[in-house]
Design a protein with these regions (language model features):
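Conserved N-terminal segment of class I S-adenosyl-L-methionine
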Residues: 1-108, 112-116, 126-132, 190-194, ...
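Active-site micro-motifs of SAM-dependent methyltransferase domains
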Residues: 100, 120, 153
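Conserved helix-to-beta-strand junction in the class I
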Residues: 133-139, 182
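Short, glycine-/aromatic-enriched active-site segment of Class I SAM-dependent methyltransferases
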Residues: 146-168
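Short alpha-helix
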Residues: 167-182
C-alpha cells in the first residue's frame, strides 16, 4: 500500500490549498505579530542558542527568528515543494524526514525545539516515540514550543479535518499527559487568541474576551454544570514544554 503521506507531502504546497509561500518575504507580514510574540515571550535572550524547528514549511518562522538575531537556527521539512519555496526565498531550510533527523541528533544538543502545526500529523504511537526523541535531544532546562488543533474548541474541527494529513487534535490535558509521560517537568498551554497590533485586531481581541468566549463558557456550564477555570476555546492553542 502506498504511503499517502509521501504522496501528499511531495507536493504539499501545491495540493494543500492553503499556506502557499508568498512571492517575497514581504508576504510573511500577516504572520509577523504571531511569530514576534512567540520570540518576545518564550525565546531565551541568548542569541547563540541552538534552535531546531521541525516541520518548518517554507520557513516563515525561521525568517523572523533570524531577523531577531538568533544565529544558530536550523529548519527541517519533509516536503520537497515547501523546501523549494524556502530556497527561492533564500531561507536556509533543509529537506529531511523529521523523525529520522531527530534520531540522528546528539543527546542534549538543542536549546529550543519548535513544532508549529506539526504534531497533529502523527498517529499516537508515532507521536509518543517522537516526543521521547524530543526529550533526548533537548538540553537540560531546554524548551519546546508547539502549536496544535484544539479538540475542546467549538471551532476545532475546522482545523482537525481541514487537512487530510491531520491524524489528531489535542486538549491542554492531553498535551500534559503526552509530554509528562516522556519525562518533561513542565507543560503549560495557552490560547491562540487575537494579538492586538492595530484597531481591527484590538476589536477582535475585545470581542473574543468579552463576548464570544463568555457565551461558549456559559453554554458549557449549562450542559455540564461547570467549566474548567483554565479551559481553552480558541481553535488552535500553544503549549510551552520545559525539560
Amino acid at each position: 500500500m502506498k504511503n499517502y503521506r509521501a504522496k501528499i507531502y511531495k507536493y504539499y504546497s501545491n495540493v494543500s490549498g492553503k499556506d502557499l509561500a508568498p512571492q517575497t518575504v514581504e508576504g510573511f507580514k500577516p504572520r509577523e505579530p504571531f511569530y514576534n510574540k512567540l520570540i518576545k515571550e518564550y525565546f531565551p535572550q541568548n542569541k547563540e542558542i541552538k534552535i531546531l524547528e521541525i516541520g518548518c514549511g517554507y520557513g516563515a518562522f525561521g525568517y523572523f527568528i533570524q531577523q531577531a538575531g538568533y544565529k544558530n537556527y536550523i529548519g527541517i521539512d519533509g516536503s520537497e515543494s515547501q523546501v523549494h519555496e524556502a530556497k527561492r526565498l533564500k531561507i536556509n531550510i533543509q529537506l529531511a524526514n523529521l523523525v529520522e533527523y531527530l534520531k540522528s541528533i546528539d543527546d542534549e544538543s538543542i536549546d529550543l525545539l519548535i513544532a508549529i502545526d506539526v504534531i497533529e500529523h502523527f498517529t499516537k504511537e508515532e507521536l509518543s516515540d517522537l516526543v521521547d526523541d524530543m526529550y533526548r535531544v533537548l538540553k537540560k532546562d531546554g524548551k519546546i514550543i508547539t502549536h496544535q488543533p484544539n479538540a475542546t474548541s467549538p471551532f476545532g474541527n475546522s482545523i482537525r479535518y481541514g487537512d487530510f494529513t491531520h491524524e489528531l487534535a489535542f486538549t491542554h490535558s492531553s498535551m500534559s499527559q503526552l509530554f509528562l509521560l516522556s519525562g518533561f517537568n513542565s507543560v503549560k498551554s495557552y490560547e491562540d487568541k487575537p494579538i492586538p497590533h492595530g484597531l481591527k485586531s484590538t476589536i477582535r481581541l475585545f470581542l473574543w474576551e468579552y463576548l464570544v468566549k463568555p457565551i461558549y463558557k456559559f453554554a458549557l456550564m449549562i450542559e455540564s454544570g461547570g467549566v474548567e477555570k483554565d479551559i481553552i476555546l480558541t481553535k488552535n492553542f500553544l503549549t510551552i514544554i520545559k525539560k
